[in-house]
């Protein structure tokens, strides 16, 4: 199920196009079960939706930029290509992030709350730098990188760090299940609503949505959700 928004009101993304993706039966139905931020109460999936992933990869606004994040294994994600969506491997450990970079995938790292003052730093020769929107008020994705958001740069040799935020932030980097920032608050409201009101053919809906975006638009796929195939989906 897919929810599309032409102009987001989210302060961190800024007024850009965004999407939310959920399962039909479970909000976390498109997210990998292996994700350490996944709540125990949600099942998730172990399978990528290949048709939808292809749609995401292709869905870049004309003259614009698109990016997203996935908690599926880095090697299962497409390598960056010109004029395609940049799909960042979302990693739970610095070791995973370094490996993703070695595999040629752009990577981001969900860092524990107590690490906020540790960035930037190098780990095994790879630079880890915190998301600029976390370091300054009134700064967002639209302004990032002088028109080239860091997360929209596929061929990069550094990892973007997102320090834990949201009500479950203290769980990130621990053995406790959960920690997903989208588990509560305004993001959760929109995400849960996607399950009941979103477009059922999400691949087709996404392609149609992108065709209608203005030239030069920025698109962040999946404020919440992932590229998985919900268990039991046709």
Language model: regions and residue ranges:
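Class I S-adenosyl-L-methionine
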Residues: 1-234
């Amino acid at each position: 199920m897919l929810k599309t928004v032409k102009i987001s009101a989210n302060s961190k993304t800024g007024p850009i196009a965004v999407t939310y993706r959920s399962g039909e039966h479970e909000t976390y139905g498109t997210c990998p079960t292996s994700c350490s931020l996944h709540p125990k109460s949600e099942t998730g999936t172990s399978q990528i939706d290949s048709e939808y992933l292809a749609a995401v990869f292709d869905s870049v606004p004309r003259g614009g930029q698109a990016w997203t994040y996935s908690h599926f294994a880095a090697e299962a994600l497409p390598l960056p290509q010109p004029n395609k969506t940049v799909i960042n491997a979302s990693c739970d450990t610095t070791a995973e992030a370094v490996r993703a970079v070695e595999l040629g995938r752009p990577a981001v790292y969900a860092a524990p709350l107590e690490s906020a003052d540790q960035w930037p730093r190098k780990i095994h020769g790879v630079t880890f730098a915190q998301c600029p929107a976390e370091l300054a008020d009134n700064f967002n994705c639209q302004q990032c990188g002088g028109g080239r958001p860091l997360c929209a740069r596929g061929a990069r040799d550094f990892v973007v760090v997102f320090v834990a935020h949201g009500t479950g932030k203290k769980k990130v980097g621990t053995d406790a299940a959960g920690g997903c920032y989208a588990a509560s608050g305004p993001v959760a409201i929109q995400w849960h609503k996607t399950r009941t009101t979103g477009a059922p053919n999400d691949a087709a809906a996404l392609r149609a949505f992108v065709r209608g975006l203005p030239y030069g638009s920025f698109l962040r796929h999946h404020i919440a959700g992932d590229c998985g195939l919900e268990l039991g989906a046709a």
